[in-house]
Amino acid sequence: MRNLAQGTKPSAPKEEQEIFLACIDALLPEIRARAGETERLGRVPDDIIAALTAAGVFRAVQPRQWGGLELDLACFYEGMIRIASACGSTGWVASVVGVHPWQMALFPEAAQREVWAEDPDARASSSYAPTGAVRRVAGGFHLSGRWHFSSGVDHCGWALLGAVVPEDEQGGAEFRTFLVPRRDFLIDHDSWRVTGLGGTGSKDVVVDGALIPDYRTHRIVDVYHGTDPGFAVNDRPYFRLPWRLVFATTIAVPAIGAACGAVEAYIAQNRQRVSAYGGPPVAKNPAVQWPLARALTEVDAARGRVRATWTDFLARLEAGQEIPYEQRVKCLYEMAYAHESCTGAVYALLGVNGGRTMRADGALQRFFRDLLAMRNHPAADLEFSATMYAQAKLGVEPPPFVSTQRVVL
């Protein structure tokens, strides 16, 4: 796998993708066997992160000139679904941390060079909610504050942190993402005590007066206008995919994967299960069968939508076409709906799985708790995305761009 990540142009992209997925498949038994350990530890074990790194997970969408693979997002997302089917927490960290190189490719070249020139395996966590304080200073910005829910931060040398630059003589207020090195932030190890996604280590990070040069910032205004400075060196259509939708899908695929894992656990538990009161195997009970059929259908549909959407989006851009606004908001809604449908389907399985469901070491209940945690991410806001999608179909004008918000379609 290492040879695939050396920045050379792939001679057989399909073969490269198959190798990537095969490397992930080889890791799944170990990831699955240690899902309980991951949750108890409160973060993904170091050796699992090392194995994911060797498999190319954290270079999958990284620019080739910095040692990345630039795999199609449809392939990357399929890999993340598979990882999450073994462990929801590991899948979440792999997906979120794994997609950050794609956004970092939109930063100025100087930032990319600083991160990857000496270490192509450098990783970044994130916390985009603008909870910190920032002000302009000579050559850049002064950044301070506390950011929550920085998934996988224990394994990262950088953090992508959101803040709103206040209006001043140089311009109006605007949202930016700040790329902060590990030396400039602290991790609050007591900030992650949760009932779902416990193994993600989504801890608070604290910055006390870091100086961030301008080149280590990413402006939402550039996302809106398609003027990201990274396009100067990463000019392929691949990097012009809609960042908001890239991230929304990044959050959805661990939910799809966790639901896959829950379905697999349900099938394994009920194939041979017999009621303590006697009678035929529970597998012959329609009450056990019907929720399974629903869950299988919901998971397959969500998985198929991810594959079809991102194959279509990339094909459009490579053909020199725009992605219509209606298709963008449709994607936003479908990714939020994946959370809703997968969580609901797994909940239905819980109700007919018997008392063993609530054992603390049970995979099914762990997947469900992880799904509930994922369902509370802002990217899973079904009402917001449904409104946007329905308005587009009804001919309602889209809302105006707001430079202080992160939502750009």
Predicted regions and their residues:
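Basic/polar N-terminal segments that are highly enriched at the extreme N-terminus
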Residues: 1-26, 404-409
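C-terminal helix-coil-helix/basic helical segment that borders enzyme active sites and/or dimer interfaces
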Residues: 32, 36-39, 301-337, 347-358
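Glycine-rich flavin
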Residues: 44-54, 58-156, 167-172
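DPxDG-like acidic metal-binding loop motif
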Residues: 146-192, 201, 354
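Glycine-rich beta->alpha junctions and the first turn(s) of the following alpha-helix
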Residues: 195, 202-299
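Generic structural signal for well-ordered, non-transmembrane alpha-helical segments
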Residues: 257, 293-300, 332, 336-343, ...
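Short segments within alpha-helical structural elements
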Residues: 344-351, 382-386
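Glycine-rich phosphate/cofactor-binding loops in nucleotide/flavin-utilizing enzymes
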Residues: 355-409
